[in-house]
Amino acid sequence: DFSALYVEGITQIAAEDIQYAKELGFKIKHLGIAVHSDAGLETRVHPALVPESALLASVNGVMNAVQVVSDGAGETLFSGPGAGGAATASAVLADVLSLGSAIAGQSGAAAQRQNQNQDKPKAGPAPAISRVAMDDIASACYLRIPTVDRPGVFAQVASALSAHSISIEAVIQKEQPASDASVSIVIMTNRVVESVVNAALKELSALDTVVGEITRIRVAPTH
């Protein structure tokens, strides 16, 4: 059910986020994530911070990749061209040709498969898998908070996060040119449940010292 899939684009990502991520040892990738655990199935699509040492961090340019983490095989990465003009056109053309071949041979092949399978026992329905709500998923987060440039603002931000039991793991706050009216406070948090982060961001956004939209980028799971 794709209607239940959480999807977030990249429009909120700025060049400064890429630079801050690099300083923190990460790269920003737009990921589709599926995790099956005892709690159920997590499915989501959003920008994520990937450690520079991770396999996915090396996927660049027109390359796309699928990383699979399993108990038996550990981490495996499958990559190939699939983004950009020529690479996308090639992939689409391959799909069209494959579909055309399937349609052309469908009648004979379908009849043959029906004869082969009619005596086979039918498989039962797949077991239901519970879906983990986005609000219940825990992630470490990168927060870029635009604030007025005056003393005491960071203490306000830290207090608001602490009120929601969110720990600060790293901070970047750079001096801005005198002509700039605002300054960005960049914070890396511990792993926190999504609903808690949302509540904290709502409180932060209500502060009169926060002067713009807060950017939040989740850290990709490292199973």
Tell where the protein language model's regions lie, with residue ranges.
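An anion-binding loop in the catalytic cleft
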Residues: 68-79, 93
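Glycine-rich phosphate/pyrophosphate-binding beta-alpha loops
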Residues: 52, 75-86
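Conserved active-site and cofactor/substrate-binding residues in soluble primary-metabolism enzymes
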Residues: 5, 9-16, 60-63, 83, ...
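Substrate-binding/catalytic subdomain of NAD(P)-dependent oxidoreductase enzymes
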Residues: 1-58, 63-65
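Short acidic, glycine/serine/threonine-rich loops at helix termini
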Residues: 80, 90, 104
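A conserved regulatory-domain signal marking ACT and ACT-like small-molecule sensing domains
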Residues: 96-223
